[in-house]
Swiss-Prot record:
SMART domains per record: PP2Ac (SM00156)
Native species: Caenorhabditis elegans
Protein name (Swiss-Prot/TrEMBL): Serine/threonine-protein phosphatase 4 catalytic subunit 2
Matching InterPro entries: Calcineurin-like_PHP_ApaH, Metallo-depent_PP-like, PPA2-like, Ser/Thr-sp_prot-phosphatase
Gene, per the UniProt record: pph-4.2
Reaction(s) the record says it catalyses: O-phospho-L-seryl-[protein] + H2O = L-seryl-[protein] + phosphate; O-phospho-L-threonyl-[protein] + H2O = L-threonyl-[protein] + phosphate
Phylogenetic classification of the source organism: Eukaryota, Metazoa, Ecdysozoa, Nematoda, Chromadorea
A GO cellular-component term linked to this record: nucleus
Reported function: Protein phosphatase which seems to be involved in larval development but not essential for embryogenesis.
Amino acid sequence: MLEEDAAGPDQLGPNDLDRQIEIAMRCELICETQVKSICAKVREILIEEANVQVIDTPVTICGDIHGQFHDLMELFRVGGSPPNTNYLFLGDYVDRGYNSVETFILLMLLKCRYPDRITLIRGNHESRQITQVYGFYDECVRKYGSGQVWKHCTEIFDYLSLAAVIDGKLFCVHGGLSPSIATLDQIRVLDRKIEVPHEGPMCDLLWSDPEEGCSGWGISPRGAGYLFGGDAAELFCENNDFLRICRAHQLVMEGYKLHFRKRVVTVWSAPNYCYRCGNVAAIMEVTEENIDSDPVFEVFEAATVENRGEPKKQPIAQYFL
């Protein structure tokens, strides 16, 4: 069912947003005209945000979602519904899952309604090129009959921040570190309002991975970003007075993983990834009381079949016949 009501960004007041959020929470499609208005509204908010967002505790950190809408609902059930819980999402909202459209629209609506309680930063899948390969573009065309919604959403990707810092102690990013970046100031001066480059510091922040046994920097098997070792993580934390680096980007079967004597934490929030990996997911809960201690996680499983619903079977593409 398509929700047909439409309003411009200036007309999207709290009551309008509440109504749209209620619709979006049911995993119902919102019409293209309304999506355009939502994108315009969230753009007005994101354009004012810095490359590095400053966040206060308490906040709950979420890793990759990848269009698994019903598992996002499970995440909210476990972690608390907005605005009762403050959330920092580390990117990769779309691709691979069945409901990338509904997932990203809901997160944009929540950002519009609660801009100080929802923080969205960019992942490597918030990219025009990547989403044309891994599902988001095709899903938009299938559900809306054209690529216009994809175009509106990918324009918003360019405005997402690149990193966040919690209480001046935790550095949060989608992927990892860059040999080109020693201090936060070097992130602050980047021009982020572009398509994700194939190389360079912005690319590295979204694509890099920690690697045990790596000294300094290594070549990434992903073909973008770098592998970075514990020494690189230690130096970055020392240079910027950080306790820890929090990132997502890698599937972790247990939902989270501690690297380099807890200097780096991976958080993964898509349970049973791609509906077949069998992993659990996690969120990381950060408070003023626990930020200096070991990380605190809530682990959760995929939504049940009853709560998930099944995607409609699509016609088989001709090249498979």
